[in-house]
């Protein structure tokens, strides 16, 4: 059982009601395993990797003239040259190089026939394909220095799907359709039309009768009829028509009166023919029954009727019978004929109607093409629909159809599609056949006819059995395949054009890998599924990597996606989170995997269940897909259980195919693993989620992803137990690779010394400090282990941003009161105490990057220098001798960060100037100041500077100094590792020798030892290693052997460390890669502190968001009886209508945690003699409220030091975990209230801070976990005086990024009109907008202190006239109105 008090490196009281038997699987497993299966970079045998399969699907490539072939012989992957960090700093892609080995075969061939006769020559060559972006250990990609994530795509699974949808032509009419969806290739649609004709469409082209497709596949008319209809033999006796009596033809009610050969009525029309009665009739000898004439009239012939005498075909197959034709048949004296029985159960006239519909078009084609064979004509008809206007022969048409569905290069339904088709249509085609077969097409249509006639099952396209996940590996394989197909075409073209001798030809002459390069680069750089990684905090990063998008190539388009696709489906249970999805137009199209969900190798999502047998829960855990779950009866996780594993009661509420039913407990087959399996990671971090409305929970889970990392982190008092899981799987924390003891530790390094079966080893972990993330938040790691502490493998040893003791910590625990406060918390606004600012509670650090390039220009090279023309000395005193700002400088807007001068264009100097230059030398006047200045909205401390210099150019002193410092750091690191490994070696050797007796006499310094004596550790430690080498010879051979083994192991370890060090130095020595034309690149990183301000957005975890409206002095805030001042005042009206009651319960539990923490603090402060015993008792008493935990046992086993450490943490507030759907119950609340000595209503008397008067009503006060979101007012507020204007309209541009103006819209105009502010309005619409001349005149008038002149004509008017003129309408603007007389009007 995994439920324990331990959470990260602290204790947390867990209120789970169900024992947790399975740990949450690694949250990033899907991405990791998918990419690993694609590349298999670390495997020795890579034959099964996705990349190998792609290459094999395209090769071999043959020359159309049978002269040469290209074969694929394997691929090779070369590891990355740079580390992840360096790629980010240098702005390059973190990638592996891919090489493929290609074999070129030259063939001997017969000159006459052109056939191959034997191999002439074979050449093999390794060809570099391209660099493929390589997944970092944090499951992201570095593309051009930017960290990106490839989101998993949720798309329609290949296979066959049957639907019922509304006809586009006539409203209300439902039509039935079948679709065969491939992964690659032409889509095939079969659809009924309102006239009951079955049509087929290929790739949404014009529809054609389905029988044309069957004929093109080679079926004759009779074959098709036999495939779709029972053929009934009509026997003629005494001018009456009879059929053989078969009871199975009369399922359900009988359509017509059934009479025997003598005309006796057996079954009346509309009655049922039971099995019993049918059997009785057979026993009575009824063999034939009369076929009514009126029913026979509308039937069609299944075989032609031939005149026996002349041999002439009177009536062809499918001729519709009528009175005249039947008379003729009787006259001819024919005994029997066959009809198509289209009135049999489950049949309709669709195929017959299709035959009738296709007759006209085939007749026309017969005349135009001059071909008699209808099958060839059908193929030509399809070709003409697919490629209209192109010339066609019957061979081309047949080959085209063959390519369309039966060619593996053009068509692929994948293993998944084949499996689904076999399952749906009852086929047993082998899984490796991933093209269509004729049988697939026939069976699809047969099933569609059944569906139309109420016998088949309509599919639900939103069922997760019909949707699958394409993860990074598959998406990349598809891109690679499309690139290779383009390359294959180019190679074939090249092969066919090669002439002359082929002896000198090499594989690289044929292969152009640029096509592959372009497709892969496009996918990563601009693809819809390759996204800029959300790095605001660890949670946002993890959920971004677990995201499932229905958009992207081959997916849905958000503008066209309907409501059904977006809705929550019963099969989402345990697979896709029903809560976490964006608000807005992407709602429901972008989802997240549930906590325990896994994705199987076919891409279907699996949910975890425990098996139930005979009403007893077993320990067996199974993962099922939505399709496997069909028909299963599943009990919920919170079903009551007795005796540890038996379901209580005789009946239980359970789910079956999305319906809730009441069943006997013995019929239950499965039970949910845990209630948490329903929701995703972000939603499972919301305590008391079960008490929140889904809309607000959605906002809550989305807003947690926007929480900014704070300066000081603090884990929530009220958590859910998922905090440790997120911290465990986020790359921001460092986990120990192997177990061992912390040997050395500082703020930047952790060294762990351990031992395994191979001997001792040392693991070094480098901590990251002050790094900028994608969202400009600050990323810093800090150690949470101590020197000498033993660390398990996989244990978290450092906290990242938003982490506290290996738990996720997104915000702060704040004392909150729900009450109005002078109208300042109207409409969700938040009133905040000044204490929060003073104590830096919600202060965050943001790092911004500014960069500048020095380029090679036509007339010289730009230079980064301190020597800038026309700049005062005091403006550059913070720059070093290279002209770059010093680290630690506090910069303000307008300050120079990097000095840069650019040469002016060549100006011919005057003779005087030339003379002066000759005397005084070149002067600095021919350069322009192009320095990098600190932008307007930025202020902060320079935390880092990176300088990159192109090969062949001198490095400046600053770059040389940075290089020397890094080299020194690497050397110190290497030296420390060697020292530790040396010390461990000596300890091992001394330990070995001190236990063994001497075999010969030995002497250490002046002391002699006789054979058989043992030398103590103290004496051995006095000797140096050279003396030890001599001393070992006095020991037995076995001891010497062990000694040599130890020496060898440690020498190998040291060699490994040295190789590692040399590798790092080699990378450091590498030249910088810069874009062409760039000589030097300088990046400056500025850290800005952002305190909480009025206008910042804050939120709780329950979707309760608001804007800080006022920051109140601490003394004015409400306070409790015991003098506790409230931190935040929230509006109580934000709770009832939003229905997120979880926040109230959180506040109560938070206050309980704090009060219990104070009780522990009192024990510390009292310092009684047996205070440890008292602490232990208190902690057991608190933890015992949660039933499931073995708290007493755990706490009693703890050492005093451990206990005091955990109690110190609890003294700031006892930490609780209330998991979703199994949180704290009312009874547990009562016990906790009692322990915390609180009132049962959870309310408190509050006093007004300004007057000291008590508020009339008692107020809900408690601790809520509040987050500061990344919508910061500092980054949003912006003002413009004058600035850029739009080119066409001449109106100011919009937005902060462009330094734009505020839009004065329609409603603002109404506001000015309402106030009668005519002049202000005129000003707004002219000189402040697009009156070009007017604004220039106004500017002049203001500078000269003159009155502002009348506005001119707005540019909009000129734009309008130009647009009208472009339509051919002559428009003139008249400067003044002429007199009426002159214009000729009265």
Swiss-Prot record:
EC number: 2.7.7.6
PROSITE patterns: RNA_POL_BETA
Pfam families: RNA_pol_Rpb2_1 (PF04563), RNA_pol_Rpb2_2 (PF04561), RNA_pol_Rpb2_3 (PF04565), RNA_pol_Rpb2_45 (PF10385), RNA_pol_Rpb2_6 (PF00562), RNA_pol_Rpb2_7 (PF04560)
Cellular component GO terms held in the UniProt record: DNA-directed RNA polymerase complex
MF annotations from Gene Ontology: DNA binding; DNA-directed RNA polymerase activity; ribonucleoside binding
Keywords attached to this entry: DNA-directed RNA polymerase, Nucleotidyltransferase, Transcription, Transferase
Name of the top EC class for this enzyme: transferase
Cystine crosslinks: none
Catalytic activity: RNA(n) + a ribonucleoside 5'-triphosphate = RNA(n+1) + diphosphate
InterPro entries named among the record's database cross-references: DNA-dir_RNA_pol_bsu_ext_1_sf (IPR042107), DNA-dir_RNA_pol_bsu_external_1 (IPR019462), DNA-dir_RNA_pol_su2 (IPR015712), DNA-dir_RNAP_su2_dom (IPR007120), DNA-dir_RNAP_su2_hyb_sf (IPR037033), RNA_pol_bsu_bac (IPR010243), RNA_pol_bsu_CS (IPR007121), RNA_pol_bsu_protrusion (IPR007644)
A biological process from GO: DNA-templated transcription
Domain of life according to the entry: Bacteria
Subunit record text: The RNAP catalytic core consists of 2 alpha, 1 beta, 1 beta' and 1 omega subunit. When a sigma factor is associated with the core the holoenzyme is formed, which can initiate transcription.
Recorded family membership: Belongs to the RNA polymerase beta chain family.
Function: DNA-dependent RNA polymerase catalyzes the transcription of DNA into RNA using the four ribonucleoside triphosphates as substrates.
Name of the protein in its database record: DNA-directed RNA polymerase subunit beta
Gene: rpoB
């Amino acid at each position: 059982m995994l439920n324990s008090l331990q959470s990260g490196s602290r204790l947390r009281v867990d209120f789970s009601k169900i024992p947790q038997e399975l740990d949450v699987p690694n949250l990033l497993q899907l991405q990791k395993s998918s990419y690993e299966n694609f590349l298999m970079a670390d495997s020795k045998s890579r034959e099964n990797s996705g990349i190998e399969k792609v290459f094999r699907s395209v090769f071999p490539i043959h020359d159309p003239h049978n002269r040469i072939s290209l074969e694929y012989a394997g691929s090779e992957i070369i590891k990355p040259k740079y580390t992840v960090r360096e790629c980010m700093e240098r702005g390059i892609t973190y990638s592996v190089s891919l090489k493929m080995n290609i074999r070129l075969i030259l063939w001997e061939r017969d000159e006459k026939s052109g056939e191959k006769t034997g191999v002439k020559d074979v050449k093999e060559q390794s060809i570099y394909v391209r660099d493929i972006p390589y997944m970092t250990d944090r499951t992201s990609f570095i593309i051009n220095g930017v960290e990106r994530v490839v989101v998993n795509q949720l798309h329609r699974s290949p296979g066959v799907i049957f639907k019922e949808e509304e006809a586009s032509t006539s409203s209300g009419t439902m039509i039935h359709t079948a679709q065969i969806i491939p992964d690659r290739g032409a889509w095939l649609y079969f659809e009924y039309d309102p006239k009951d004709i079955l049509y087929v469409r290929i790739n949404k082209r014009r529809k054609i009768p389905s029988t044309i497709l069957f004929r093109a596949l080679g079926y004759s008319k009779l074959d098709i009829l036999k495939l779709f209809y029972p053929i009934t033999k009509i026997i003629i006796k005494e001018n009456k028509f009879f059929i053989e009596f078969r009871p199975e033809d009369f399922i359900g009610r009988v359509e017509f009166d059934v009479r025997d050969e003598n005309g006796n009525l057996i079954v009346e029309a509309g009655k049922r023919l039971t099995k019993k009665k049918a059997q009785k009739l057979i026993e009575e000898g009824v063999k034939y029954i009369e076929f009514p004439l009126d029913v026979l009239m509308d039937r069609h012939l299944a075989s032609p009727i031939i005149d026996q005498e002349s041999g002439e075909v009177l009536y062809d197959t499918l001729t519709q019978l009528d009175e005249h034709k039947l008379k003729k048949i009787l006259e001819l004296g024919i005994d029997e004929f066959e009809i198509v029985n289209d009135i049999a159960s489950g049949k309709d006239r669709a195929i017959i109607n299709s035959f009738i519909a296709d007759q006209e078009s085939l007749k026309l084609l017969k005349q135009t093409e001059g071909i008699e064979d209808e099958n060839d004509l059908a193929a030509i008809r399809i070709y003409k629909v697919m490629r209209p206007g192109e010339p066609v022969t019957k061979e081309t048409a047949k080959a085209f159809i063959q390519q369309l569905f039966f060619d593996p290069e053009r068509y692929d339904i994948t293993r998944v599609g084949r499996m689904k088709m076999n399952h749906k249509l009852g086929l047993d085609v082998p899984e490796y056949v991933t093209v269509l077969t004729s049988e697939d097409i026939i069976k699809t249509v047969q099933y569609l006819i059944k569906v139309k006639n109420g016998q088949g099952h309509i599919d639900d396209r939103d069922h997760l059995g019909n949707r699958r996940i394409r993860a990074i590996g598959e998406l990349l394989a598809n891109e690679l395949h499309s690139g290779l197909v383009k390359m294959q075409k180019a190679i074939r073209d090249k092969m066919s054009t090669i002439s002359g001798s082929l002896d000198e030809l090499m594989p690289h002459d044929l292969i152009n890998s640029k096509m592959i390069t372009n497709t892969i680069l496009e996918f990563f750089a601009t693809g819809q599924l390759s996204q800029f990684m959300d790095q605001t905090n660890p949670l946002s990063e993890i959920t971004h990597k677990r995201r499932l998008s229905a958009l992207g190539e081959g997916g849905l388009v958000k503008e066209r996606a309907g409501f059904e696709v977006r809705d929550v489906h019963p099969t989402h249970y345990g697979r896709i989170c029903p809560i976490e999805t964006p608000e807005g137009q992407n709602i429901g199209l972008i989802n997240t995997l549930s906590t325990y969900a896994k994705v199987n190798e076919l891409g279907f999502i699996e949910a975890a269940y425990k098996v139930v047998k005979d009403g007893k829960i077993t320990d067996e855990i199974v993962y099922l897909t939505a399709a496997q779950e069909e028909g299963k009866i599943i009990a919920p996780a919170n079903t009551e259980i007795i005796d540890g594993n038996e379901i209580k009661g005789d009946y239980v509420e359970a789910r079956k195919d999305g319906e809730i039913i009441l069943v006997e407990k013995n019929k239950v087959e499965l039970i949910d693993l845990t209630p948490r399996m329903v929701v995703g990671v972000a939603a499972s971090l919301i305590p008391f989620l079960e008490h929140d409305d889904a809309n607000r929970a959605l906002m809550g889970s989305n807003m947690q992803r926007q929480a900014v990392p704070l300066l000081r982190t603090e884990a929530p008092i009220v958590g859910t137990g998922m905090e440790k899981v997120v911290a465990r799987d986020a790359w921001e924390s460092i986990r120990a690779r192997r177990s061992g003891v912390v040997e050395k530790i500082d703020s930047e390094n952790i060294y762990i010394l351990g031992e395994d079966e191979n001997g001792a080893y040392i693991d070094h972990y480098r901590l990251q400090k002050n790094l900028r993330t994608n969202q400009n938040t600050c990323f810093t790691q800090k150690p949470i282990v101590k020197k000498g502490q033993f660390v398990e493998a996989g244990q978290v040893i450092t906290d990242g941003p938003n982490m506290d003791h290996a738990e996720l910590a997104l915000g702060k625990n704040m004392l909150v009161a729900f009450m109005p406060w002078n109208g300042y918390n109207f409409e969700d606004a938040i009133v905040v105490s000044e204490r929060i600012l003073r104590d830096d509670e919600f202060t965050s650090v943001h790092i911004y990057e500014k960069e500048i390039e020095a380029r090679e220009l036509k007339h010289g090279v730009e230079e980064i220098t301190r020597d800038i023309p026309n700049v005062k000395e005091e403006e550059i005193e913070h720059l070093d001798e290279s002209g770059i700002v010093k680290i630690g400088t506090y910069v303000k807007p307008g300050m120079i960060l990097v000095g840069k001068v650019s040469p002016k264009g060549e100006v011919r100097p005057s003779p005087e100037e030339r003379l002066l230059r000759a005397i005084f030398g070149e002067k600095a006047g021919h350069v322009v100041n192009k320095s990098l200045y600190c932008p307007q909205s930025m202020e902060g401390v320079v935390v880092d500077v990176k300088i990159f210099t192109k090969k062949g150019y001198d490095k400046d002193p600053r770059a040389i100094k940075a290089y020397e410092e890094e080299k020194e750091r690497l050397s110190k690191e290497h030296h420390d590792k060697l020292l530790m490994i040396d010390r461990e070696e000596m300890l091992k050797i001394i330990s070995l020798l001190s236990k063994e007796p001497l075999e010969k006499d030995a002497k250490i310094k002046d002391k002699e030892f006789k054979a058989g004596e043992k030398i103590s550790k103290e004496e051995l430690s006095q000797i140096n290693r050279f003396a030890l080498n001599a001393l070992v010879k006095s020991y037995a051979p076995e001891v010497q052997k062990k000694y040599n083994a130890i020496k060898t192991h440690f020498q190998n370890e040291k060699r490994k460390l040295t190789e590692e060090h040399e590798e790092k130095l080699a990378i450091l020595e590498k030249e910088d890669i810069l874009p062409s034309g760039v000589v030097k690149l300088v990046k400056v990183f500025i850290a800005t502190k952002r305190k909480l301000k009025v206008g910042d957005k804050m939120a709780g975890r329950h979707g309760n968001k608001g804007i800080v409206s006022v920051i109140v002095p601490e003394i004015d805030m409400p306070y409790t009886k015991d003098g506790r001042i409230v931190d935040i005042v929230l509006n109580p009206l934000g709770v009832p209508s939003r229905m997120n009651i979880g926040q109230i319960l959180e506040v109560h539990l938070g206050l309980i945690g704090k009060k219990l923490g104070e009780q522990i603090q009192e024990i510390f402060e009292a310092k009684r003699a047996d205070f440890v015993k008292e602490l232990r008792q208190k902690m057991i008493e608190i933890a015992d409220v949660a039933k499931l935990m073995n708290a007493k046992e755990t706490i009693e086993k703890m050492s005093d030091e451990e206990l005091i450490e955990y109690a110190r943490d609890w003294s700031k507030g006892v930490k609780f975990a209330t998991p979703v759907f199994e949180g704290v119950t009312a009874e547990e609340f009562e016990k906790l209230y009692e322990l915390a000595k609180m009132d049962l209503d959870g309310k408190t008397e509050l006093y007004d801070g300004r007057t000291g008067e008590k508020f009339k009503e008692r107020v809900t006060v408690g601790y809520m976990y509040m987050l500061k979101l990344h919508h910061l007012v500092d980054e949003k507020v912006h003002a413009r005086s004058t600035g850029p204007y739009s080119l066409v309209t001449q109106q100011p541009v919009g937005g902060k990024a462009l330094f734009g103006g505020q839009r004065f819209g329609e409603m603002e105009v109404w506001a000015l009109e309402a106030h009668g502010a005519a002049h202000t309005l005129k000003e707004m619409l002219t000189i402040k907008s697009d009156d070009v001349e007017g604004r220039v005149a106004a500017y002049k008038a203001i500078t000269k202190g003159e009155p502002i002149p009348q506005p001119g004509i707005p540019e909009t008017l000129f734009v309008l006239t130009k647009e009208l003129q472009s339509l051919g309408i002559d428009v003139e603007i008249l400067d003044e109105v002429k007199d009426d007389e002159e214009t000729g009007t009265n």
